[in-house]
Amino acid sequence: MAAVMSRRALACLFAAARPRGGAPFASPRDAPLRWLSSAAKDLPARDPRLFCVVGSGPAGMYAADRLLTHYGASARVDILDKSPVPFGLVRSGVAPDHASTKSVVNRFEGVLSDPRVCFFGNAALGRDVSVDDLTPRYHAVVLAYGATGDRTLDVPGEDTLRGAISARRFVGWFNGDPEAHGDDVEISLHGAKNLSLHDEITACLTQHRDVSHEPCTHDDTAKDRSKREMLSNGDPTEIEKKPATAEAPTAVIFGLGNVALDCARILLRDARDLRETDICAAALATLERSEVKKVALIGRRGVAQAAFSPKELRELLNLPDVDVRVYDDEVTEADEADLEASRPRRRAREAIEKRKARGNDENEIENVEIESGTRRKNRKELSVRFLRSPSALVARDDDATRLGSVILEMNELRGPPGSRRAVGTGATETIRNVALALRSVGYRSKPLEEHFIVKSTHEPDRFKQSVPFDAARGVVPNAFGRVTHSVAPAMGGGEWQVPGLYVVGWLKRGPRGIIGDNLIDAEETVGALVADDARGMLRKPDYRFKDRGVAPLLEARKKSTVSKEGWRRIDAEERRRGAEAGKPREKITSVLEMLRVANEGG
């Protein structure tokens, strides 16, 4: 259920609230809900419109673009972002070897370059300004700050063991996110000293592992055990046949979406192939020294329900020098119905079948190394394991703070086609010698936390507004992008619209879809805003702020922000550093350094 406003809040807002009457509207998209305030004024279309977009990722940039397109010369858009640099997950969430996906930045740069747009980087909603600060300064505020949290596995060891992190943070690490690399950002994990996420991931990927931690799975036959006994006794014949990856540590990735595939691909591909991409230099250095040679992708349901897209799956399955093993990808009659209903899933299954048919060329030896009379192949291994759920993350025998193995429960699917659910069977298997476990089971938006209280000077008795949040769905409740609030039955009940407040992107619909989906989403939200404007239902900015937006407030609070000119200086410096290294850019990984570069000459 959506959050319910307190009686005190309603008492302040209800005094002037009036449900709007009039002729019926053509569709629910155009029909305004009941309003929580009488702030709306009749605004002639020729008057300037001041808008604030909170978040400069794809959703925010598309929303700004649509506002500029619709309102033309009368629009002014201020864009706020907690990061010093714009473009959100296009910068920090797209894999470095997918440069074509990042080309959308060219369009977003055009939006930023528009003289009607101002950018305020390093200005966080809830930390530096509040919703209560913004709404009286603009005709409308569009929330586009996305999903900054993660869904969890809810298993023992997930929150306590070093080496267990979210895929979101891992992606941020190889993309140079300051939260992973900055010298001003530290983490503390289960008794470990404070260290950056980069240091933690480096320790996971490059630490020495003992052969006693060799992986063991449910198909660990007596013959396999016998071979290991011969290996331990030094049988040269069996050493000759031993796979190169037998002693290598494993990375386990929970989830079968495209983010999981990105993480697996970065871990498995030859790191030298990434040198000419915009991957963070520190992350590249770690990957080049990585001891991880095996990656296990774990999915709780079957191949017919997996979320990955065919193109990304084919790319992963066909990496050079990577053996592929697939477990429990058989399909039932009910699975066939799921496949029939989804062309992408059919194509994904075909990609798996084609890769299995090709097999692994055990005779192919790349980068042969002669050492003590044995041959070792410089190959890696990908295993895709369907119908498994994590049961526990277990510490190493020699280090109670560090991840050592993963226990999985085998699943079976129940239910009709289209709603098949995974149910545990009680049977388990263990993957040992696990250096890194990434959870990639979905992003999640968080409720806005306002860490300070600023007494309103323009309306001393006004209720301090926050952003409603539907914790069950992980979104800001809305109707076609109009932010709504559930009102207690004693106060009239129903869904009421919060005046002048709109939402777009993952914060609006949940964390799903591709970058292009945000354009459609932004068009819907801006369409609702325009419809409200046509009926005189936008806010009128308080005249005491002189149509200057949030800039004077940030200046008064002595907040060091990054303008679009400052961003251009950061961009130029990153490109300069990249050119020296033969790559598109070398991202700056410290907020403090970003601010220094942005303010040079400014």
Feature roles, as predicted:
Residues 46-57, 247-257:
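Beta1/beta-strand and adjacent pyrophosphate-binding region of the FAD-binding site
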Residues 85-140, 348-377:
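N-terminal Rossmann-like dinucleotide/flavin-binding domain of flavoprotein oxidoreductases
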Residues 50-73, 260-267:
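N-terminal Rossmann-like FAD-binding beta1-loop-alpha1 element of flavoenzymes
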Residues 108-160, 391-405:
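Feature captures the FAD/FMN-dependent oxidoreductase FAD-binding
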Residues 150-289, 471-489:
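Glycine-rich dinucleotide-binding loop and its adjacent helix/turn
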Residues 1-47, 211, 602:
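N-terminal mitochondrial targeting presequence
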Residues 486-490, 496-602:
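C-terminal, flexible cofactor-proximal segment of oxidoreductases
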Residues 71, 75-79, 261-428, 449, ...:
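Dinucleotide-binding/catalytic capping subdomain of oxidoreductase cores
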